[in-house]
A protein has these predicted regions:
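Phosphate-binding P-loop
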Residues: 11-13, 20-26, 34, 103-107
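Short glycine-rich substrate-engagement loop in P-loop NTPases that contacts/grips substrate
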Residues: 69-107
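Conserved AAA+/SF3 P-loop NTPase catalytic/coupling segment centered on the Walker-B
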Residues: 97-132, 163-164
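Walker A/P-loop
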Residues: 29-75
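AAA+/SF3 P-loop NTPase mechanochemical coupling elements
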Residues: 94-95, 101-109, 139-157
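Dynamic helix-loop-helix/coil hinge segments at AAA+ ATPase domain boundaries and subdomain interfaces
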Residues: 1-16
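A short helix-turn-beta junction within AAA+ P-loop NTPase domains corresponding to the substrate/partner-engaging
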Residues: 52-56, 165-175
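Conserved Walker
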Residues: 117, 134-150, 161-167
């Protein structure tokens, strides 16, 4: 698995080295730069070039790290319990998978894009450290552990709107 660019995306030698090092060493690739410089498109082109599925997680200022893992809908469960709905007996009916969960259980090794990570609050990157390192996470409501079948190729973009934590940066290749 090597990325050499595509007909639609001409990559510099430095970028090719960074992408291939991140893939080979199974570490996230952090791509920093101004808006509109092709950072997001890079993940799409890596997926195309490697014939891999692309899973996109577009981060907003209100995004929390847990949303990338899963979301538990306690309000719907409470409402259903008051209405006597049978679904309430299985808490799994109220858990929605996040983008990391989708990437962890994908049949083929996917490219996971975490787009514009610097839009979220300062703790967001640190909140993902363990999950990205260990490639697993715990679902508190069910007591289950979700483990990655295979480590996804992780591409993280940043517009340099704010500094990212050092502990997070140490775990990434960057370009």
């Amino acid at each position: 698995m090597r990325f050499e660019g595509t007909s639609a995306y001409v990559a510099t030698d430095d970028l090719k080295v960074a992408v291939n090092a991140a893939i080979t060493l199974e570490r996230p690739l952090l791509v920093k730069g101004e808006p509109g410089t092709g950072k997001t498109v890079l993940a799409l082109e890596i997926a195309k070039a490697l014939n891999a599925p692309l899973i996109e997680w577009h981060v907003k200022s209100t995004t929390k790290a847990l949303q990338g893992l899963y979301e538990y809908d306690a309000v719907s469960r409470l409402r259903d319990s008051q209405l006597g709905d049978e679904r309430v007996k299985d808490i799994r009916n109220y858990i929605r998978r996040g983008k990391l969960w989708d990437a962890f259980v994908a049949d083929e090794r996917p490219v996971l894009l975490i787009d514009e990570i610097d839009k979220a609050d300062i703790e967001f990157p640190n909140d993902l450290l363990q999950e990205l390192d260990r490639m697993e996470f715990f679902i508190y409501e069910t007591g289950e552990v979700v483990q990655a079948r295979r480590r996804p190729i992780v591409v993280i973009t940043s517009n340099n709107e704010k500094e990212l934590p050092d502990a997070f940066l140490r775990r990434c290749f960057f370009h």
